[in-house]
Amino acid sequence: MTSLLFAFSLFLSFSVGSIFPFSTSNGPAVNDTLQNAIRSQRDVSKPIPIDRVGFSGVSLSSFFESEGYSSDSLSNLNGLLKENVDGVMIDLYWNEFTSKWQLCPAPFPNNITYTTASNRIVDVSWNNKTYKCDPNLSTDNIMSILNSFIRDTNTDVEANFMHVMYNLKSIHYEKSNQTISLENIYKEKNSNLNVVGMDTLNDTVSLLSSYIFTPTLLKQYQSTSNKYTNSSSSIRYIDSLNETQAIQDFYSQSTILMPSLQTVLLTQYKRLMVHVVTNDMAESSRSYQISSSDKDTIFFNSDLPASIFHTDNASADELCYELSDAYNRTDVNIAEFNKVSLNATLRLVVDDDKTPFTTKSLSKYVRCGYCPIFNSTEYSSQKVTEGNSSIISREFASNLFWSWAPGQPSGPDNCINCTRPTTNNTSKHSDDNGEEEEGNNIAYKCVALTEEGWEVSNCYEKYLFACQNKLSRNEWKLNNSTKRNYFDIDDDDCPEGYFFSLPRSNIEMLSLMTTVKQENVNYPIWIDLNDITVENCFVSGGPYAQCPYQETVTTDKFVRMIAPSFVVAMVVLVLIFIEKVFRKTPIQTNRKRYWKKAIQEYYAKNDYEGVPS
């Protein structure tokens, strides 16, 4: 019975493990290297204004066009969000017949019955095009997925900042005698009919309202920051500036004063912005009128301009060429880089089926300040499931980072195509007797800049090191005659007004790489980034900088962790209780009765009085 009980408990533990898994991921598992790259680039960018923090996004139009306008077409979205896709571009249509915002580009005939059944696909036509649309599909389907992802990642370690981008369009018709028949077909006849769609722009994102960084919050921040600037107008000496103050001072010169990623994400606990990046609504008396409530929630071009470029023309490449060649024999054209760094603009580059992104073009766009939006229908051709990552992740994961080289961050054993020194540049160190001897120490804990990007390198190697101007973030100095190992680098090794630092944005990164070309020095070059104190927690501030994170377990994760063990333990206790109370061993029962009867018969035959002699 005991062996049977053990076997049953073992079987039950496996069964419960399948019911209450430790991981409840509904999408592909993100590998550790990619996760570390995402988190470390986010951490490095914390002091940078949120509009200049790079991100990548997807256009949902490509999903809808290839699979139809239904909730099934959104099945890949959750998986993409886990793969470093932080933006969602949505084409939103104002239906002039119903006065509703909808996702389908065509109006629905008024004889369609609206039911709660999901995926009820119908063929609808408009402007000589036919679409497959679900009348029940609305922006709530998209926002529910975003809301679920935000709640699952709402910790200091996992939280990222996201963007919802609207392209506003119209389902428009000209009012005339000939259009009366159109109104009879598409205009709702029953005012009590529950037509799917949203009345206002604000309603389209209402599910995410508690997570949205709004124009109202921006105005409050600007008001507070202006008061602080006015109250602290005393002259600061350069030497007294810490890095955070230096970054704030530089970006306070921007065309629009924006808060940092640190302020929005980890102080105000806001996770996304909503932008109207294009407004192509037809001018009409039936057109949607943007309200003050919309303006309080959603960013328009008057609040934060958006510039959209397309891969099918050369306009996006012009800026990249200008910045890459912004140097001559004597110096780097810092003004060109500062003009981009201080211009508060959302720069987007969108591809298509004819000119999709390549790994080379994508890296170029990301490095020169663009946010790529994947719009080609080939990205939606394959389902994203557990163990089956998206095409974007498989082909472009390494190219979505302006910082890390492909395959990084990773140690020497797992590194692919890493730049490793071919000569022994390890430093000398003193032994216990104070004598200097050649060191053979190896510690792949420090980060160096290579031609491909950042790489984890041996801290004891002697490289050049990057010195950044405290007051001008795009101005760098590289002393070609001085090499140090990471532990020996000090701010005093940099020229006056400069300090040992690292790029914190794509433009700062490009300005440093341009300086390398202008000064004609060799890679690798040390930057102020390491994971010495805690593995895979990359921090700046020298070798003694501390990791800001502690291992945290959310309530949901804790419940999932203990549920299998708790259920198994309870079942085992119940079985033990049943065994003790209800079960009797027949052999033991018979033995007890036999000896009791034998003793009674013995005393009956040998009944004494007194003490036997």
Curated annotation (Swiss-Prot):
Glycosylation sites recorded in the entry for this protein: 31, 111, 128, 136, 177, 202, 230, 242, 313, 328, 343, 375, 388, 417, 424-425, 479-480
Cellular location(s): Membrane
Domain of life: Eukaryota
Keyword set includes GTP-binding: no
Any Pfam family hit: TIM-barrel_MTC6
UniProt membrane topology term: Single-pass type I membrane protein
Record's keyword terms, sorted: Glycoprotein, Membrane, Signal, Transmembrane, Transmembrane helix
Gene Ontology CC terms: membrane
Signal peptide positions (record): 1-17
Protein name: Maintenance of telomere capping protein 6
Organism per entry: Candida albicans (strain WO-1) (Yeast)
